[in-house]
C-alpha cells in the first residue's frame, strides 16, 4: 500500500520485580519536545502518516511503584507522590541539558557499560542533543533496570544492543502518575455526578489506541447518563 503499517516491535522482560518494556514504536518518525511548563524537559515520539523519515524511535519503560520513589512513610501517604517524582525527574533532566530544550543523550552500549558518549549520531530531535551520562544521574532503580533489560533484549535479538542506538532523556508521561477514581460500572466519578474521568490524563489509558477505546466507552456511558436526566 501507499503507507507503511505500524511496526511489529515489542520487547518485554522483568528485572528485580519490575517490568521493563518497549512502548509505542514509531517507525519513520521523530522524537519531539513535549514539555508543558517551565523548567521541564520531556520527550515523546511520533510518526507522520507516510512514516518516511530515516529514524525509528520507541519509548523504553521501567515499571514504577510508589515505594520506588518516596523517601518517607509520610510521603507514601501523599496521593500525589508519583506526580511530584515525575516533576523532579523532568526538572533534573532540564538541568542536565543546561536549562535548555536540547535533550541529554547517550549511546546505548555506552549507557549499559557506564561510559560517557563522546559523540552522538544524528537524531530526529530538532532542538538537538547533548552528551550526558544518563547512567549516572537518572534514578538508579530506573537506570539499573534499563541496563539489565537492554542486555536481555540484546541476547534475544541480535543487533539490539548497539552503540548506533541513542537513548534520549526522558519520556516521563507514558502513563498518568495519578488515577482519578471512577465507578467500575458507570465509569463516573465516585463523588461527582456527571463527571467521567477518561483516557491517559485520568489514568485509564497509556497510548493512542487505549485512550481512544476508553474514550468511546466513556462517551457511551455519558450518553446513557444524559438520557436519564
Q: What do the PLM-derived regions correspond to, one by one?
A:
Residues 1-229:
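Residues forming the flavin
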Amino acid at each position: 500500500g501507499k503507507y507503511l503499517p505500524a511496526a511489529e516491535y515489542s520487547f518485554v522482560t522483568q528485572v528485580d520485580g519490575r517490568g521493563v518494556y518497549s512502548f509505542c514504536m514509531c517507525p519513520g518518525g521523530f522524537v519531539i519536545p513535549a514539555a508543558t511548563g517551565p523548567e521541564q524537559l520531556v520527550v515523546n515520539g511520533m510518526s507522520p502518516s507516510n512514516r518516511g523519515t530515516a529514524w525509528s524511535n520507541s519509548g523504553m519503560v521501567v515499571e514504577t511503584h510508589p515505594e520506588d520513589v518516596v523517601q518517607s512513610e509520610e510521603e507514601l501517604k501523599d496521593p500525589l507522590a508519583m506526580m511530584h517524582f515525575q516533576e523532579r525527574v523532568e526538572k533534573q533532566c532540564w538541568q542536565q541539558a543546561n536549562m535548555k530544550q536540547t535533550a541529554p543523550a547517550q549511546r546505548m552500549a555506552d549507557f549499559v557499560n557506564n561510559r560517557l558518549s563522546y559523540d552522538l549520531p544524528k537524531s530526529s530531535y530538532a532542538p538537538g542533543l547533548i552528551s550526558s551520562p544518563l547512567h549516572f544521574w537518572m534514578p538508579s532503580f530506573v537506570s539499573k533496570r534499563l541496563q539489565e533489560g537492554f542486555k536481555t533484549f540484546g541476547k534475544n535479538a541480535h543487533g539490539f544492543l548497539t552503540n548506533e542506538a541513542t537513548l534520549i532523556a526522558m519520556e516521563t508521561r507514558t502513563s498518568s502518575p495519578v488515577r482519578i477514581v471512577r465507578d467500575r460500572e458507570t465509569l463516573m466519578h465516585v463523588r461527582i455526578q456527571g463527571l467521567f474521568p477518561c483516557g491517559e490524563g485520568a489514568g485509564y489509558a497509556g497510548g493512542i489506541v487505549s485512550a481512544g477505546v476508553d474514550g468511546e466507552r466513556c462517551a457511551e456511558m455519558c450518553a446513557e447518563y444524559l438520557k436519564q436526566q
